[in-house]
A protein has these predicted regions:
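Short, acidic, metal-binding catalytic loop of nucleotide-sugar glycosyltransferases
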Residues: 45-54
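A conserved acidic beta->alpha catalytic loop
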Residues: 61-70, 89, 124
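Conserved donor NDP-sugar-binding/catalytic core segment of glycosyltransferases
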Residues: 92, 125-160
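Active-site nucleotide-sugar/metal-binding loop of Leloir-type enzymes
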Residues: 99-116
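Short beta-strand-to-loop acidic/aromatic patch adjacent to the donor-nucleotide binding site
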Residues: 113-125
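Conserved nucleotide-sugar donor-binding
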Residues: 169-184
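Acidic donor-binding loop at a coil-to-helix junction in glycosyltransferase catalytic cores
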Residues: 191-198
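Non-catalytic, C-terminal membrane-associated alpha-helical segments of glycosyltransferases
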Residues: 233-316
Length: 316
């Protein structure tokens, strides 16, 4: 894979306002991006306005052919802690590419001393004290290994929050460094759902994971729009759930609960569960371990029976 690390053109502003860079609780960010000229500026503006700035922000451009790289480079002239890693264009999008590019970015970071590592999508907008408040959650809970705010699509209600408060979407995952090192990095899953794998693995390692519901983030682009129409996406979600080892009972209950919640009503749930059943019948190959499957199914049945709270607890 060919890559080009574009260095900032100016270095005389690197240590401006060093207090905002958090000398004692510093963090770094990595953002995979591909053709996000309509949204990337919102995300960059949100980051540079933070009350606690990252020590380094590495953006990995996956062969962007629009103005994405130009927009990023215009900010790099002033904010030298923003870096750009350019990759050659590829023909087809895939879920695993996001993980591979994020991993490449993490391995390419030049900053060695930091306490937290954040993954950040390129189509988000958030409050100026987002990272300061998020880091505050880690200060309050020494066992918290992975956390993040709630990404709400533009136009959707910010009052209806996810029931599952222990899984953090990949768009906003923020790690205590010890946790990220303990889970041994990110796991690419061809069917998607790598972020769920990350959260579950962190809990298996004894860390707490938390969706921080008082930190709401605007998600500016409809999710998963590059992977086909609505029904094709529902089928793929069923395939994904099988690949992640979901318990069949949990999957049926989940799909039943969505019968009249998601359009097209009824048929969406039927297509979703059909993708799961087809993968089961054809014995689709999984990349996860039996230990992982046992753990995730135990958590799911605990949620169904009310034996597990919405926030995970570490193993003892």
């Amino acid at each position: 894979m060919h890559s080009e690390l574009t260095e900032p053109q100016s270095t005389n502003l690197q240590f401006v306002n060093s207090d905002r860079h958090g000398q004692y609780s510093g963090y770094v960010l990595v953002t995979p991006v591909r053709n996000e000229e309509n949204f990337i500026k919102n995300t960059i503006d949100s980051v540079i306005k933070q009350t606690k700035l990252p020590r380094e922000w590495l953006i990995v451009s996956d062969g962007s052919t629009d103005e994405t790289n130009t927009i990023i480079e215009s900010y790099m002239m002033k904010y030298t802690w923003i870096k750009l890693l350019k990759l050659k264009p590829r023909k087809y999008p895939c879920f695993a590419a996001v993980v591979k590019n994020a991993t490449l970015g993490i391995n390419s970071l030049q900053t060695e001393t930091y306490r937290y590592l954040g993954l950040l999508d390129s189509d988000l907008r958030f409050q100026a004290d987002y990272f300061e408040k998020l880091i505050g959650e880690f200060h309050k809970d020494a066992n918290l290994g992975l956390a993040g705010g709630v990404a709400v699509d533009i136009g959707h209600s910010k009052e209806v929050l996810p029931r599952n408060r222990q899984d953090v979407p990949g768009a906003l995952q923020f790690f205590r460094r010890e946790c990220f090192e303990a889970i041994d990095g990110l796991t690419p899953i061809p069917e998607g759902g790598w972020d769920s794998v990350t959260c579950t693995t962190a809990r298996m390692k004894g860390f707490t994971t938390r969706l921080v519901t008082h930190l709401i983030v605007d998600h500016l682009k409809p999710r998963n729009t590059i992977y086909g129409g609505v029904l094709k996406r529902k089928w793929q979600l069923g395939v994904r759930d099988y690949a992640l080892g979901y318990h069949p009972i949990f999957e049926f209950v989940k799909c039943a609960g969505r019968l009249f919640r998601e359009k097209p009503y009824i048929i969406s749930s039927i297509v979703w569960i059909s993708g799961f059943l087809y993968s089961t019948i054809t014995n689709r190959k999984r990349l996860i371990s039996n230990e992982f499957i046992e753990h995730v199914r135990s958590e799911q049945m605990g949620r169904l029976t009310g034996l597990r709270t919405v926030e995970s607890r570490p193993q003892t």
